[in-house]
Amino acid sequence: MGKMAVIAHGGAGPGPERQENLQKAVDVATELLLAGASAIEAAVEACVVLEDDPVFNAGTGGVFRNDGSVLLDASIQTSDGRIGFVIAMPDTPNPIRVAADLLDENINGLTGLGARKWADNRGHANRPVEGREPIEGDGDTVGVIVRDSSGAMACATSTGGCSHRPPGRVGDVPLPGSGFWVDETRSVAATGEGEDITRALLSYRVSSRAESPQCDSLMDAMRWGLNELIPDGASVGLIALGKDGAGVGLSNTVMPWASWTED
């Protein structure tokens, strides 16, 4: 059983300075783990910190779509095989909470107004998200991976979507294997240009690559993913956490990330 650990990223792309903001989320997850929280609880609450911070393109900081709407995606997966995701949710400042509520349901994902109605029935906050204008090169996703004292892992991701996209567009964040992947041995989360991440099925293939005898480490698998699966010029980053050891991050562009590992 590995020691407890947390790793989080604040999106691929230059954007505003956000390293200290990201560290606050890692600190929240750390405090929860030390108090006995599960990987799911710590990952969700750390992601909520990022959704509540308008510097990030997620939750309250979600960017406008082409029509001026703010539609939010989020996902969570656990090392025991559960998944929850929501797509294009309106009026939902913390979509990760809704996604997490799906973990124990007989459905994995919900979209749009159907997701909002389901969230209303579960008592999730329903209030307009003001949104903001896209910033050129803005980071497009937040992600948190946690390993708790039992060795269980959870990955939570959230986004307002890439800048300058139509209201029906779906990126990598809510798509298992693309924006995230968790199994019993490791967890991977991606950020950046969602179409390229999705075409590559990046998170799943990086995780699978780590099993290969040609691969020496998670970092080696991540480097392979960025170099071999992502086209030149596409800005993409990855974070990952194994069943032991510290989390690692790698990007072909600016990607703030922060981590903690139990002493």
Task: Name each model-derived stretch.
Residues 1-263:
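Alpha/propeptide regions of enzymes that mature by internal proteolysis
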